[in-house]
Amino acid sequence: MKFIINLHYQLGQLLNYLQSPALLAARLYVAWVFFAAGLTKIKDWDNTLLLFQYEYQVPIIPPELAAYMGTAGEIILPILLVFGLFGRLAGIGISLVNIVAVLSLSDIPPAAYNLHLVWGAVALPIIFWGSGRLSLDAFLEKRYD
């Protein structure tokens, strides 16, 4: 029994050590996905505006404002995630962009829907545990704590 308890403890220590690299990987993955989407929107802005006017059904706000806000979120929030700056807020923001994207598509294919679920799930640890030790958040916390 003592062997199992020690093994469990050592495994916990290893996983604690790997938490920050795992959070970094999560931040980089989510940032890459959303930043690429934002660049696509910027690259063909006229088409982006048409999509927001006729394809996406963003609730409450006008289509043009939704296009600007969504694109800004897809460009700015990933940069914050890469550097681990305001990681929890950036994770929440990315999650909101993700949720609005799913809600605004009336006929989202199952594969695309599943990808949005994955991106949301990957963002959750960032929201709950922050950016980790490999981040500007950790640097600033040490400096100003």
Where are these regions (language model features)?
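Extended, low-polarity transmembrane helix blocks
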Residues: 1-43, 60-72, 76, 82-145
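A glycine-rich, hydrophobic loop/mini-helix early in the fold
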Residues: 43, 47-51
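Extracytosolic (periplasmic/ER-lumenal) interhelical loops and adjacent juxtamembrane/interface segments
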Residues: 50-64
